[in-house]
Each structure stands twice: as structure tokens, then as C-alpha cells.
């Protein structure tokens, strides 16, 4: 497989869209919604049911607080921190971790307008 196709396929697996997350929530599919933003950001706007674990705390807390067998959807503001955390989690054996593309900003704008945009 050529490198570009391989990279695109891996990225697709590492990301999930806000709309796909909404469908999973509506269907009652079990997964952990992991918010890796800072506490002040979480207080400003967050998705219902999200677990706050700031990015800087992930390495010291992930193995104690997260289940490597569970699907984990990682959320941040725009998707950069969540992609970094997702890559780290995958390296640590959390093979079902995915970053929500566009972060809570995309969620607010495309799925749930009640969640504040900041």
C-alpha cells in the first residue's frame, strides 16, 4: 500500500466526526467521552457526560482512570490536543481511542448549538 493511502486510512481510524459521536450517543452505545482541555475551558463549555482529564495529566492518570478495552472519544477545543492524546493513548495500548474531529467547537457549531462557542 502506498504511504499516502496508508496515512489517510490510519487518520480516518484515529478520528471520528461530531455527527458520528451524536449517532453513537443517540443509539446508547457505550464509550468514554474524554475531554482533555483545561478546567476553565471545561467550565466554559462541555459535552454532557464528558470526563475531564487535562492533556498534561493524561500520562500520569490514563492507566489508572481509563479502560484500554473501551472505546474512548477524545475531545478538545479544535481537535489538535485530542489528536495528540489519541496518538499517545494508541501507543499505550488504548487501541479504540479516537479524536473527535474539530473538537467541541465543531460539536457546538454542527451538532448542539446549546453548547457555547468560545
Which residues does each PLM region occupy?
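Rhodanese-like catalytic fold shared by cysteine-dependent sulfurtransferases
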Residues: 1-32, 39-71, 80-118
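Short, surface-exposed ligand- or partner-binding patches at beta-edge/loop junctions that are enriched
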Residues: 74-75
Amino acid at each position: 500500500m502506498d504511504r499516502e493511502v496508508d496515512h489517510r486510512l490510519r487518520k480516518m481510524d484515529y478520528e471520528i466526526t461530531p455527527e458520528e459521536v451524536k449517532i453513537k450517543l443517540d443509539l446508547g452505545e457505550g464509550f468514554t467521552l474524554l475531554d482533555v482541555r483545561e478546567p476553565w475551558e471545561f467550565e466554559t463549555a462541555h459535552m454532557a457526560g464528558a470526563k475531564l482529564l487535562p492533556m498534561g495529566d493524561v500520562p500520569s492518570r490514563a492507566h489508572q482512570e481509563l479502560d484500554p478495552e473501551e472505546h474512548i472519544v477524545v475531545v478538545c477545543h479544535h481537535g489538535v490536543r485530542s489528536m495528540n492524546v489519541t496518538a499517545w493513548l494508541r501507543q499505550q495500548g488504548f487501541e479504540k481511542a479516537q479524536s473527535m474531529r474539530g473538537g467541541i467547537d465543531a460539536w457546538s457549531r454542527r451538532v448542539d448549538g446549546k453548547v457555547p462557542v468560545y
